[in-house]
Amino acid sequence: AIIEPAADCFDPKTIRASMGAFFRVRIHNYKSFEEYAEEAGERDYFPFMLKGRDLEQFTPEKTPNRPCSLIFGNESRGLDDGYLEVGTPLCIRHLNTVDSLNLTIAAGIAMHWQFHTFNY
């Protein structure tokens, strides 16, 4: 799901960069998070933010076994503080020698955590 404001996934450069994967992925665009949440239904939300809880301390016992959404913000600005009230905010801790994580890398780490921790 892509929630506005967001990058234009239909931009020709984006489609070219996907090397054809664009045509094999279902993409849904939403005008707001509220619109997305209404359609997504009952689920857990995990916004990834600098003010979130340490990802490593969050275990399956602390959440029901149901669908969940991993929420990421813009690479330069992240998510608005309003997302602190949405679900369970999490943070990917890293060494002080690392300035920041690229959005793609952060999403990859989070998905690995999700599939490994929750045994999907």
Where are the regions a protein language model picked out?
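Structured adenosyl-cofactor binding patch, chiefly the S-adenosyl-L-methionine
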Residues: 9-23, 80-120
